[in-house]
Every structure is written in structure tokens, then in C-alpha cells.
């Protein structure tokens, strides 16, 4: 077995879609918590810092996923290993997974199980929105007063004498 995983030169969307559809068909179809009508849907992937980043919804979950990008070599990791990553959205904990015939990847559960009241269109829109959100820069209000570092350290509020 190789010690490194080669990246995808182009988006792995089609391979990821096919792999999750096979999992759904082969081993997940009889579980009671499955969304009864949600198909597998994979958002478009975006290259972020050399890695393919996107989201996938299945009848059993919605997850953010990361696959190795062009010219990347990932070390082979233990499936189920946890890795914290800093994305523009914030720090997220990912779990190493492996899709047969695709590669190892990183996955962060965003929703599981899915609400049975969610329509297919809502699920697909949510998947696309989540893919954009995890790579969106956080927005803050510059007019909100911030306590200085010294005030935080010594328990003083702005406006008090130092």
C-alpha cells in the first residue's frame, strides 16, 4: 500500500457523487433514520489552498469534504483520525475517511440525520450554501467597540482609568 495519496488534477465531483451513490445503494438503504427521498448531491468543488473543498448531502448526512488538490501528496492517515483545520469560516474538526475507488478525504459533519421535512431542492441549496459559507471570510462590524488587550488582562473596561 502506498504511503502517500496523490491529488486530483481536476475536481473529483463526479467520482465523489458515484461513490456516495454506491454506498447509499449498497449499505444504507434500510436504515430507519434516512431521509426517504433525498438523493446524493455533491456541490461544486473549489480549490482552496491547493485542496478541493465542497459539501455533500446524502439521505443520512450533510458534510463538508476536502480532497487533495492538483500536485498534492497527502500522507496516508488512519481512517477516523481527527484533524482540526482553520478555514475562513473558522476552525473545524474533520475526520479522515476513505471512499472506495476514490481516495482518502476529510469530512466534517454539518447535519445528521437530516430533517425529513427538508425538500430535495432545500437540501441541494443548503449543500451549495454550506460549500460557499465554509470558504467565506467572516464579516464583523467595525463600529462595535472592542476592549483593549490590557483591559481584558486586568478586567478594566474602556473609559476607566488605567
Curated annotation (Swiss-Prot):
Superkingdom of source: Bacteria
Any one Pfam family match given in the protein's UniProt record, by short name: NiFe-hyd_HybE
Family, as annotated: Belongs to the HupJ family.
Record protein name field: Hydrogenase-2 operon protein HybE
Amino acid at each position: 500500500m502506498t504511503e502517500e495519496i496523490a491529488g486530483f488534477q481536476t475536481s473529483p465531483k463526479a467520482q465523489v457523487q458515484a461513490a456516495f451513490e454506491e454506498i447509499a445503494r449498497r449499505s444504507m438503504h434500510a436504515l430507519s433514520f434516512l431521509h426517504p427521498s433525498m438523493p446524493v448531491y455533491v456541490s461544486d468543488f473549489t480549490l482552496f489552498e491547493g485542496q478541493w473543498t465542497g459539501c455533500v448531502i446524502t439521505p443520512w448526512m450533510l458534510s463538508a469534504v476536502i480532497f487533495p488538490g492538483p500536485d498534492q501528496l497527502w500522507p496516508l492517515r488512519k481512517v477516523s483520525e481527527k484533524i482540526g483545520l482553520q478555514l475562513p469560516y473558522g476552525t473545524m474538526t474533520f475526520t479522515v475517511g476513505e471512499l472506495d475507488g476514490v481516495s482518502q478525504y476529510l469530512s466534517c459533519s454539518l447535519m445528521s440525520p437530516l430533517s425529513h421535512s427538508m425538500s430535495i431542492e432545500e437540501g441541494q441549496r443548503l449543500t451549495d450554501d454550506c460549500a460557499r459559507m465554509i470558504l467565506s471570510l467572516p464579516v464583523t462590524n467595525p463600529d462595535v467597540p472592542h476592549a483593549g488587550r490590557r483591559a481584558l488582562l486586568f478586567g478594566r473596561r474602556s473609559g476607566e482609568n488605567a
